[in-house]
């Protein structure tokens, strides 16, 4: 256990930050799952820019890795092209 006030504060801050980051990572995962479930191309084309922006924001804040965001955006863009 922490012996210094500053280390106790650091633990509190880390836990709060971890919960905050987990919330946004979970939100992004749910958005990606919902996007993959879409079957209408026009609906997917409308939602893609919002989802791509969300992934870019999370990558910029180091909540997800920038390469993971790029890979997800690429796969989702290819998915749009396969929809009829």
Curated annotation (Swiss-Prot):
Alphabetically ordered keywords of this record: Ribonucleoprotein, Ribosomal protein, RNA-binding, rRNA-binding
Top-rank lineage group of the source organism: Bacteria
Keyword Nucleus: no
Tagged with keyword Transmembrane: no
Protein name: Small ribosomal subunit protein bS20
Lineage, highest ranks first: Bacteria, Pseudomonadati, Bacteroidota, Bacteroidia, Bacteroidales
UniProt xrefs under NCBIfam families: S20 (TIGR00029)
One Pfam short name: Ribosomal_S20p
HAMAP family recorded: Ribosomal_bS20
A GO cellular-component term linked to this record: cytosol
Single GO term (MF): structural constituent of ribosome
Role played: Binds directly to 16S ribosomal RNA.
């Amino acid at each position: 256990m922490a012996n210094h006030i500053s280390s106790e504060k650091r633990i509190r801050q880390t836990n709060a930050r971890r919960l905050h980051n987990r919330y946004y990572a979970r939100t992004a995962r749910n958005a990606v799952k919902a996007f993959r479930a879409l079957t209408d191309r026009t609906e997917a084309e409308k939602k893609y820019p919002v989802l791509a922006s969300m992934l870019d924001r999370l990558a910029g804040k180091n909540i997800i890795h920038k390469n993971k965001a790029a890979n997800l955006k690429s796969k989702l863009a290819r998915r749009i092209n396969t929809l009829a």
